[in-house]
UniProtKB/Swiss-Prot annotation:
The lineage of its organism: Bacteria, Pseudomonadati, Pseudomonadota, Gammaproteobacteria, Enterobacterales. The keyword Cytoplasm applies. It comes from Enterobacter sp. (strain 638). GO terms for cellular component: cytoplasm. Its main location: cytoplasm. This is 2-dehydro-3-deoxyphosphooctonate aldolase. GO terms for molecular function: 3-deoxy-8-phosphooctulonate synthase activity. Its EC number is 2.5.1.55.
Length: 284
């Protein structure tokens, strides 16, 4: 079955091509830390031959607590992204939360991301579609894989079919997430075989029902990522930090930065193996 290819500059993203890594940090904590983390990702991915897009947020507008760190904001965030692009030659992905942010962000970064909590907000979708940028759509925790087709249709109606779909888990009762990997193929089916990627970091979130911030299960990141990549998808989305215990957002789910290379060696081996197989249709 022919898979749709979405191009991010010279990086081709498709379910039957070698996987693309969308990786970086949760939120821009400082210019220096962003440079350090990006440099490490670039070094490792170039060594392993993995296509790479740097990820970070300039504003975490959906933090649980009013007291939680949000980020440097739009203007400073774009300056940092521009420096990363100029210094390391990387592509960049970041999320937008308001329609007014879509165009100025698209002028700097290569992929703009529709956050899971906002994925059904039509005005935001339309503003993002108008930019013509590649779009990464996070599947909301409360939306079934099949319903993602409706979100894709909004983008197509807005004139943009350069869509990547990203699974980050589904609600499992209160304060917990699970990943239904059967949904990956469903999302392909309802989106004309658009690229599907897996956000393993946020799928590891859990929380204290009375807490002010999410907890996480980073000790299980390798097994969950390996399982997801074994289904045959276009990419992996992951966040890492040199000191997860002191990260300003989602540290409990972040991969320790010094584990990135051995982690990616395993992921690449699985992706290479799975994509060496002929497609097997068992529906008939």
């Amino acid at each position: 079955m022919k898979q749709k290819v979405v191009s991010i500059g010279d990086i081709n993203v498709a379910n039957d091509l070698p996987f693309v890594l969308f990786g970086g940090m949760n939120v821009l904590e400082s210019r220096d830390l962003a440079m350090r983390i990006c440099e490490h990702y670039v070094t490792v991915t170039q060594k392993l031959g993995i296509p790479y897009v740097f990820k970070a947020s300039f504003d975490k507008a959906n933090r649980s607590s009013i007291n939680s760190y949000r980020g440097p904001g739009l203007e400073e965030g774009m300056k940092i992204f521009q420096e990363l692009k100029q210094t390391f030659g990387v592509k960049v992905i970041t999320d937008v939360h308001e329609a007014s942010q879509a165009q100025p962000v698209a002028e700097v970064v290569d992929v703009i991301q529709l956050p899971a909590f906002l994925a059904r907000q039509t005005d935001l979708v339309e503003a993002m579609a108008k930019t013509g940028a590649v779009i990464n759509v996070k599947k909301p925790q409360f939306v079934s894989p099949g319903q993602m087709g409706n979100i894709v249709d909004k983008f197509i109606e807005g004139g943009n079919d350069q869509i990547i779909l990203c699974d980050r888990g589904a609600n499992f009762g209160y304060d917990n997430l699970v990943v239904d990997m059967l949904g990956f193929s469903v999302m392909k089916k309802v989106s004309n075989n658009s690229p599907v990627i897996f956000d393993v970091t946020h799928a590891l979130q859990c929380r204290d029902p009375f807490g002010a911030a999410s907890s996480g299960r980073r000790g299980q990141v390798t097994e969950l990522a390996r399982a997801g990549m074994a289904t045959g998808i276009a990419g992996l989305f992951i966040e890492a930090h040199p000191d997860p215990a002191n990260a300003k957002c989602d540290g409990p789910s972040a991969l320790p930065l010094d584990k990135l290379e051995p982690f990616l060696k395993q992921i690449k081996a699985i992706d290479d193996l799975v994509k060496s197989f002929d497609e097997l249709d068992t529906s008939n």
